[in-house]
Amino acid sequence: MIEVKECSKAFGTVKAVNKATLDIGDREVFGLVGSNGAGKSTLLRMMAGIMKPDEGQIQIDGMQVYENEEAKKLFFYISDDSYFPANYTAWDMVGFYRNFYPQFRIKLFHELMEQFHLEEKRKISTFSKGMKKQLLVIIGVCAATKYLFCDETFDGLDPVMRQAVKSLFAAEIMNREFTPVIASHNLRELEDICDHVGLLHKGGILLSKDLEDMKFHIHKIQCVLSGREQEKELEKELQVLKVQRQGSLLMITARGTRSAIMEKIQAKNPLFMEVLPLTLEEIFISETEVAGYEIKNLF
């Protein structure tokens, strides 16, 4: 488990991370999302022990991270601007990382390189940006650490590659102790990968939620009722997060179980009723608006 408690980090007069508190459980894919400049990379670097918090503390499996070699054996960190030595091939990188991760899984590396259609003996300098990111994910998984920290690693990956990585992560989580932490400025890129998402804004954690729990407790229903009085009654009876109208069509986003919400709407004898799917972005819009923020100002 990763525990971030009241962590702050400033660069001159700019506070990149401000009293951030966050818990990341084992065997979940955790997404750390926020706009550019929200503090994601700084927080991830503090988790990786690259930077020391000015205030607060970070523990991985009960150990302080900064200047702790035992704690650092537990994770592999993929930077947003990872460096590859000149003329190195993918196979050369394996030799480099095996010095730090002796448990590196060579057989799995060969299998994944073939699965992702990457050439082991090809110079990395000839790889595209997406190919380099795929290579780093493969190396990170094969390093066989408990935690994998990814800073904007999924930025620009196409849907097919994201699905491949999602399947890879799911297989690793099923077979061993494995927890990926993914920082991204793009909610849509995290939607089909993460189990849990933390929203970072101005250096602080605005909210941290389990996605299935959020989807279970927030629903969007469109319906047509016989009159405005029924609409007003319904808005009082439900935990309404958002109401939209298009002519006679009423769209309600409300908190609660699907059955409880539908039961209250059905009691009004609607002329029409339909449950609509909610995207991760729509769920976050609802949550942040209730907290007094507009998501368009966060991203």
Regions found by a protein language model. Name each.
Residues 2-4, 9-195, 199-201:
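ABC transporter nucleotide-binding domains
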Residues 15, 69, 107-111, 163, ...:
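Generic alpha-helical secondary structure signal
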Residues 16, 194, 199-204, 274-278, ...:
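Amphipathic, soluble alpha/beta structural segments
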Residues 84, 206, 282:
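Flexible, glycine-rich phosphate/dinucleotide-binding loops
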Residues 89, 210, 276-279:
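Short loop/turn segments at beta->alpha junctions
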Residues 99, 111-114, 167, 171, ...:
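Charged/polar, solvent-exposed surface patches and flexible loops
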Residues 165-256:
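ABC transporter nucleotide-binding domain
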Residues 219-295, 299:
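Short, charged/small-residue-rich alpha-helical element at the C-terminal edge
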